[in-house]
Design a protein with these regions (language model features):
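Conserved active-site regions of diverse hydrolases
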Residues: 44-46, 53-336
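Fungal secretory targeting signals
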Residues: 1-11, 15-71, 336
């Protein structure tokens, strides 16, 4: 188990047991429960506990896919983000190599999707080259916990530090794509606190970190938007409409700022290529056509006939379509 697979205190053992029941029965979880409080737990604590539990589950529910045999030369994928991107990678352990493109753990990795997530698809099913993936994403991460606090051990600022320490000298930067999918918790944590997200501060830090990567010689970026989770994930059912309206506004502001800041970033860094990939169409397509994707409805979670792996995380169908659309979206700058 990697150092960021946390052992954590639980406010209620019954809460954690309920969270675990939402995970696939085939998951393997090694975790210590510490009962240190008896007061009522609010919804935010539930989703945090569930997110951690999901992040700790080894996704063996789906068989490990065969790595594409069409290897026309090695390429690198660097991923920074949160639970929607994590595979459980620890950069101080085994690094990606031919035959083991995630490094540690092996495909499909340790995900929150009940199997192969979008990162795994880019690495193993949609590639025409050998793609070595260094996925620093960690469940619960925000851009910087000094701006939006979180229980996550490693936020994106820490993840960039890990890249610098462990990986920078090992990758051919000319054949590397940097994918950043962060923001769900940057706007989500303030939502649960009934506050507006500090979007300007988040973006300032976000692009400071991108500048660190660009200064290290990385020139090819794709930045994924925050999906419309305010109106789609099961955890939002029954939430205050006032709070949801504020969250929708924060998501819109965040995604627009991403577009605006990237344009400035590219103009300030000669040779840098980059685009913002809109995640909304992929989510909308699956949610609006749930039956086509094998789901009994658009809001159930935790079983093979549901779109959602748990009440906060997208399942296999959404991840697969998103990966397919991303491959098309970045094709002008990077071919997997």
């Amino acid at each position: 188990m990697s150092p960021h697979s946390l052992v954590f205190p639980a406010r209620s053992q019954s809460l954690i047991r309920f969270a675990f029941r939402s995970l696939r029965s085939s998951s393997v979880v090694d975790i210590l429960l510490v009962h240190n409080a008896t007061k009522l737990v609010k919804m935010k604590s539930f989703t945090q506990a569930l997110s951690i539990a999901a992040g700790l589950s080894l996704s063996f529910a789906s068989p490990t896919p065969e790595i594409s045999s069409r290897q026309n030369g090695s390429k690198n994928l660097l991923v920074f983000g949160d639970s929607y991107s994590t595979v459980g990678f620890w950069p101080g352990g085994t690094l990606p190599a031919a035959g083991n493109p995630l490094g540690n753990p092996a495909l499909p990795g340790q995900t929150t999707s009940s199997g192969l997530n979008w990162v795994g698809h880019l690495t193993s099913t949609l590639n025409t080259s050998l793609v070595l993936t260094y996925d620093f994403a960690v469940t619960g991460a925000t851009t910087d916990k000094d701006i939006v606090d979180t229980y996550a051990q490693y936020c994106v600022d820490d993840q960039v530090g890990q890249y610098t320490q462990y990986v920078s000298s090992k990758v051919d930067k000319a054949n590397t794509l940097v994918a950043v999918w962060i923001g769900i918790n940057d706007v989500g944590e303030p939502f649960w606190d009934k506050e507006s997200a500090p979007v300007t501060k988040i973006m300032d830090r976000y692009f400071q970190l991108l500048q660190t990567l660009a200064d290290d010689g990385l020139t090819n970026f794709v930045l994924l938007t925050v999906p419309p989770f305010s109106d789609q994930i099961p955890a939002m059912i029954g939430q205050s409409e006032t709070d949801l309206a504020r969250l929708r506004s924060d998501i819109t502001s965040y995604n627009q700022a991403l577009q605006d800041r990237l344009a400035t970033f590219k103009s300030s860094n000669s040779g840098v290529k980059g685009l913002v990939f809109d995640t909304k169409p992929s989510f909308d397509t699956v949610v609006e056509n749930f039956a086509k994707y094998g789901a009994k409805d658009a809001t159930c979670y935790g079983s093979s006939d549901c779109l959602w792996a748990d009440n906060y995380h997208a399942g296999l169908a959404i991840h697969k379509l998103l990966a397919e659309n991303l491959v098309k979206g970045v094709a002008e700058n990077f071919v997997f």
